[in-house]
Amino acid sequence: MVQRLALALCLGTAFLAPAAAFGTIDGLGQHTEHEEITRAALVRAGLGRETLDALAGKKGTFGAVGAPDRPDRGLLTEAAAHCDGGDHLDIAGYPQDASAAARALEACKAWKLKALGDAVAAAGRIVPEGARAIDAGQIPEYVGCVFDGSSGRAKCDVLEALGLAFHVGQDFYAHTNWSDAAAADQGGPENPPGLGHEGPAPWMDPVAGPGADFPAGLISGCFEGVPESLHCTYGADLLRVRHAALNKDAGRIDRATGAAGPGETPRGAAHGNFARAVAAAIADTQAAFAYFEAETLRVYGAERGALILCAVKSDDPDDCR
């Protein structure tokens, strides 16, 4: 999970960044958590090495899944892209009611669903309607994908959209209380209640669609700027639930197995919360990719859809002919 201000300063970007998220570089208190989660999730998905590198990132690159944390991508302050801003406590005078908090998290879910829909839509350009062959011009064979938000070759657009969906899905578990252990010491804004769920949230499963019932008690953290200690207060310096109090943003992950080490934030270090969030994020990423595969086959039919999926996964489109 990335400390975005530090990252922005490291890259020479002179603006304030939003809350942290699963890490995208190896340094500045992060350990390429987004990359490791994505690789652990898709290790058996049949992606070619270069394709997985482009999607998950590798040393020196953000990849599609890390692009929302890239300072020049323009999404650092987009709360919906990181599941931020859904804070609420059931106490008198809290400045954000439960319905407003739920709307912030509904926007996060909608971001994921739109990205998956965009991936399926872009995939259709890989094998044009009526054709029985891959359009080689839609495959990045010599020049890699950029992931800067501009539309280009179809496979790049597919990977970029999948990266957006995976990123926000992973941040959901890092930034909310869904997977946090419910413990007796919890209760206030500095240690809000965990929901104690194991595994991914059915509410975030794209199969559930936009109409699923909002999970009771689900919140994420307030983020208004850095340092966080100067923000997210109300009344006579009363605290809102801050991102700093709730995030499980940092720790080491084995990319081959998905096993997580100790959390390196206060919330992540308590009760095994980092490992719980990582396990849920891996499962969520797997479910999102399976949804993309199923939708591609449903929309384009078995024959065309299978050829499209082969081109998305393979490094060399000749392997699909």
Q: Model regions: which residues?
A:
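Catalytic glutamate of the conserved HExxH
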Residues: L164, V168, F172
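Bacterial N-terminal signal peptides
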Residues: A6-A14
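Alpha-helical and His/Cys-centered functional microenvironments
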Residues: L7, T38, D171
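N-terminal, motif-rich segments that launch catalysis or mediate targeting to/interaction with membranes
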Residues: A20-G163, H175-R321
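N-terminal signal peptide c-region/cleavage motif recognized by signal peptidases
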Residues: L16-P18
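Positively charged n-region of N-terminal signal peptides that target proteins for export
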Residues: M1-R4
